[in-house]
């Protein structure tokens, strides 16, 4: 789960991580009122959407007066911001963060991520702040430094100091940087985060160290014990189909293609998408119905897939272990009848109760194309979609 920058900074502030003074605004008038409560001088007006690259897309403005704050707020609110992370459709700006500007001396990158290679949380840092860290990793990987954190003892102060020295934070600011790193690790562990990034972390002309950005992603599997985090969820920033899927414990991610996929198991779902691509198709979604799908759940899955107007065909690929093929077949038939399905549908069933499942499909009277293997099914749905055009 993602949250906005201003929400992340509120969490940082509560954990002792230094951030600029500021607050959220939903109207130009509110933006001016926020600015009035800040130190006079330079104000920063930042669009709040769940995507990076806002600065390059014109979503961050520097104002030198209250009139400019109001002008920029009017310009940004309601604007559709297109960044490299939003896709061409962009995202509408519905709120702003207005905060004090600062005298930036140097920018750095700081992040905490889960490293599956070491089964540990890793602290990452670079003196190339303000730049996409992926670009730094590709062009100058030697400028990225890492500290693997022992899960038993946590982040040790000496590790934070070592990283601070490695990324060339001035000696007089190291202790403040170390305090921020220890505070961020506290946030990461206590809030069940999956990633925390500050880009940039800055040193200022008056010797302060501040987090000018705040990106926090949370582990969705731990949200049941993070009620305060759940309250920060902004449904306006999420795909309505993904929201609907979460109500039925379906794992759904919208993609750009035209072939809908319904699969059980994340690994099989990814393999299915790869196979569709191999035969010249383009998946419209990732949808994992899980191992405990019911007839009703399958019907809802179909509704979600068909809620995407780009979908021109559906491939159902099920391997029945805990999941029973006859239950899937009943759900597929019920959904196809209820929704009056008119686009091509290919179904591949294998595993528990597969014969009963195939019999249900065969006796349904519907135009369902069976497949014996994943490759056959993927090839058939790609061909049928092309023929239907």
From Swiss-Prot:
<keyword id="KW-0067">ATP-binding</keyword>
<feature type="binding site">
    <location>
        <position position="107"/>
    </location>
    <ligand>
        <name>ATP</name>
    </ligand>
</feature>
<dbReference type="GO" id="GO:0005524">
    <property type="term" value="F:ATP binding"/>
</dbReference>
<dbReference type="GO" id="GO:0006104">
    <property type="term" value="P:succinyl-CoA metabolic process"/>
</dbReference>
<dbReference type="GO" id="GO:0042709">
    <property type="term" value="C:succinate-CoA ligase complex"/>
</dbReference>
<dbReference type="GO" id="GO:0000287">
    <property type="term" value="F:magnesium ion binding"/>
</dbReference>
<comment type="pathway">
    <text>Carbohydrate metabolism; tricarboxylic acid cycle; succinate from succinyl-CoA (ligase route): step 1/1.</text>
</comment>
<dbReference type="InterPro" id="IPR011761">
    <property type="entry name" value="ATP-grasp"/>
</dbReference>
<protein>
    <recommendedName>
        <fullName>Succinate--CoA ligase [ADP-forming] subunit beta</fullName>
        <ecNumber>6.2.1.5</ecNumber>
    </recommendedName>
</protein>
<keyword id="KW-0479">Metal-binding</keyword>
<dbReference type="InterPro" id="IPR005809">
    <property type="entry name" value="Succ_CoA_ligase-like_bsu"/>
</dbReference>
<feature type="domain" description="ATP-grasp">
    <location>
        <begin position="9"/>
        <end position="244"/>
    </location>
</feature>
<comment type="function">
    <text>Succinyl-CoA synthetase functions in the citric acid cycle (TCA), coupling the hydrolysis of succinyl-CoA to the synthesis of either ATP or GTP and thus represents the only step of substrate-level phosphorylation in the TCA. The beta subunit provides nucleotide specificity of the enzyme and binds the substrate succinate, while the binding sites for coenzyme A and phosphate are found in the alpha subunit.</text>
</comment>
<dbReference type="GO" id="GO:0004776">
    <property type="term" value="F:succinate-CoA ligase (GDP-forming) activity"/>
</dbReference>
<feature type="binding site">
    <location>
        <position position="199"/>
    </location>
    <ligand>
        <name>Mg(2+)</name>
    </ligand>
</feature>
<keyword id="KW-0436">Ligase</keyword>
<dbReference type="GO" id="GO:0004775">
    <property type="term" value="F:succinate-CoA ligase (ADP-forming) activity"/>
</dbReference>
<dbReference type="Pfam" id="PF00549">
    <property type="entry name" value="Ligase_CoA"/>
</dbReference>
<feature type="binding site">
    <location>
        <position position="99"/>
    </location>
    <ligand>
        <name>ATP</name>
    </ligand>
</feature>
<dbReference type="InterPro" id="IPR013815">
    <property type="entry name" value="ATP_grasp_subdomain_1"/>
</dbReference>
<dbReference type="InterPro" id="IPR005811">
    <property type="entry name" value="SUCC_ACL_C"/>
</dbReference>
<dbReference type="Pfam" id="PF08442">
    <property type="entry name" value="ATP-grasp_2"/>
</dbReference>
<comment type="subunit">
    <text>Heterotetramer of two alpha and two beta subunits.</text>
</comment>
<keyword id="KW-0460">Magnesium</keyword>
<keyword id="KW-0816">Tricarboxylic acid cycle</keyword>
<feature type="binding site">
    <location>
        <position position="213"/>
    </location>
    <ligand>
        <name>Mg(2+)</name>
    </ligand>
</feature>
<keyword id="KW-0547">Nucleotide-binding</keyword>
<feature type="binding site">
    <location>
        <begin position="321"/>
        <end position="323"/>
    </location>
    <ligand>
        <name>substrate</name>
    </ligand>
</feature>
<comment type="similarity">
    <text>Belongs to the succinate/malate CoA ligase beta subunit family.</text>
</comment>
<dbReference type="InterPro" id="IPR013650">
    <property type="entry name" value="ATP-grasp_succ-CoA_synth-type"/>
</dbReference>
<feature type="binding site">
    <location>
        <begin position="53"/>
        <end position="55"/>
    </location>
    <ligand>
        <name>ATP</name>
    </ligand>
</feature>
<dbReference type="InterPro" id="IPR017866">
    <property type="entry name" value="Succ-CoA_synthase_bsu_CS"/>
</dbReference>
<dbReference type="InterPro" id="IPR016102">
    <property type="entry name" value="Succinyl-CoA_synth-like"/>
</dbReference>
<dbReference type="GO" id="GO:0006099">
    <property type="term" value="P:tricarboxylic acid cycle"/>
</dbReference>
<dbReference type="GO" id="GO:0005829">
    <property type="term" value="C:cytosol"/>
</dbReference>
<feature type="binding site">
    <location>
        <position position="46"/>
    </location>
    <ligand>
        <name>ATP</name>
    </ligand>
</feature>
<feature type="binding site">
    <location>
        <position position="264"/>
    </location>
    <ligand>
        <name>substrate</name>
    </ligand>
</feature>
<feature type="binding site">
    <location>
        <position position="102"/>
    </location>
    <ligand>
        <name>ATP</name>
    </ligand>
</feature>
């Amino acid at each position: 789960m993602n949250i906005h920058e201003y929400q992340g900074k509120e969490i940082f502030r509560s954990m002792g991580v230094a951030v600029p003074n500021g607050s959220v605004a939903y109207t130009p008038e509110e933006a001016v009122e926020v600015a009035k409560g800040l130190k006079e001088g330079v104000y920063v007006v930042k669009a709040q959407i769940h995507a990076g690259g806002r600065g390059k897309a014109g979503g961050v403005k520097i104002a030198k007066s209250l009139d400019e704050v109001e002008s920029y707020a009017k310009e940004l609110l309601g604007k559709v911001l297109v960044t490299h992370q939003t896709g061409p459709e962009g995202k509408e700006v519905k709120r702003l963060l207005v905060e004090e500007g600062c005298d930036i001396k140097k920018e750095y990158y700081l992040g905490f991520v889960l490293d599956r290679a070491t089964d540990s949380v890793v602290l990452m840092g670079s003196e190339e702040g303000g730049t996409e860290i992926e670009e730094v990793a590709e062009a100058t990987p030697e400028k990225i430094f890492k500290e693997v954190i022992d899960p038993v003892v946590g982040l040790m102060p000496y590790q934070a100091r070592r990283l601070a020295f490695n990324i060339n934070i001035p000696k007089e600011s190291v202790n403040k940087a170390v305090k921020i790193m220890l505070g961020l690790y506290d946030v990461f562990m206590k809030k069940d985060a999956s990633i925390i990034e500050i880009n940039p972390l800055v040193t200022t002309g008056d010797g302060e160290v501040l987090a000018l950005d705040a990106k926090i992603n949370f582990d969705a599997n731990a949200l049941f014990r993070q009620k305060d985090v759940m309250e920060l969820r902004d449904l306006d920033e999420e795909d309505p189909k993904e929201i609907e899927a979460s109500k039925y414990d379906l794992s759904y991610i919208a993609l750009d293609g035209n072939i809908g996929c319904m699969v059980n198991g994340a690994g099989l779902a990814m393999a299915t998408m790869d196979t569709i691509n191999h035969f010249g198709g383009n998946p419209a979604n990732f949808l994992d119905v899980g191992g405990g799908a019911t007839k009703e759940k399958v019907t809802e899955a179909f509704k979600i897939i068909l809620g995407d107007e780009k979908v021109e065909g559906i491939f159902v690929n099920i391997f029945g272990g805990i999941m029973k093929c006859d239950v899937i077949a009943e759900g597929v038939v019920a959904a196809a009848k209820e929704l009056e399905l008119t686009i091509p549908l290919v179904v591949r069933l294998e595993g528990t109760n597969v014969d009963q499942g195939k019999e249900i499909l065969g006796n349904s009277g519907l135009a369902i194309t069976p497949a014996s293997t994943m490759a056959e099914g993927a090839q058939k749905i790609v061909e049928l979609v092309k023929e239907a055009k």
